[in-house]
Regions:
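Soluble extramembrane regions of membrane proteins in the secretory/endomembrane system
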Residues: 1-173
Length: 173
């Protein structure tokens, strides 16, 4: 049970181009797969990728995947969910699964520039929305990441390619 399972949605809105939400997630996942394939002969585990939609509509894409295709979650040992509320700043680890000692240790040991603090989880749980990770966080270990600086770009016409940050994208991976 050591598969990595990043997932992402394409959740752009009518006015947003989706370069940040969720171009960041898509790009990070594709680059992660590209890098992982270079070392596939050294790995003992696999990688699964799930792209969902309708996160903003009560997590409907992830709920459907979990309800109707539950077998895709078999043998998944870790979920990485990539979010982007803003285009700038570090990729914050803002939520983990319960009993997270091993997950936090994995992050601390392997992230080049880990960035998190316990208040992030408190703030996140006060927000009116959730993430796809909500559906599995009680059953599969995982981590939720997001850049949040300049959230005024979120779901607006400012969510475009002119406002992406290569430094922020690089911090995710």
């Amino acid at each position: 049970h050591d598969s990595r399972y990043p997932w992402k949605l394409m959740g752009d809105t009518v006015t947003a181009m989706g370069a940040i939400d969720d171009g960041y997630g898509l790009g990070v996942i594709l680059e992660s797969i590209h890098q992982a394939l270079k070392y596939r002969n050294e790995w003992n585990q696999g990688i699964k990728v799930l792209f969902t939609d309708a996160e903003e509509v009560d997590l409907q894409g992830m709920k459907a995947a979990h309800q109707y295709n539950k077998e895709i979650f078999d043998n998944v040992g870790l979920i990485l969910n990539i979010e982007a509320r803003g285009p700038f700043g570090p990729a914050l680890l803002f939520e983990t699964s319960m009993g997270n000692e091993k997950v936090i240790q994995l992050y601390a040991d392997h992230a080049r520039y880990p960035f998190t603090y316990s208040l992030m989880n408190v703030v996140y749980h006060q927000m009116p929305n959730g993430s796809d990770f909500n559906i599995t966080r009680d059953s599969i270990p995982g981590m939720n990441f997001s850049a949040i600086a300049d959230i005024n770009h979120y779901h607006t016409d400012l969510d475009n390619i002119d406002n992406i940050s290569e430094k922020t994208i690089g911090h995710y991976g």
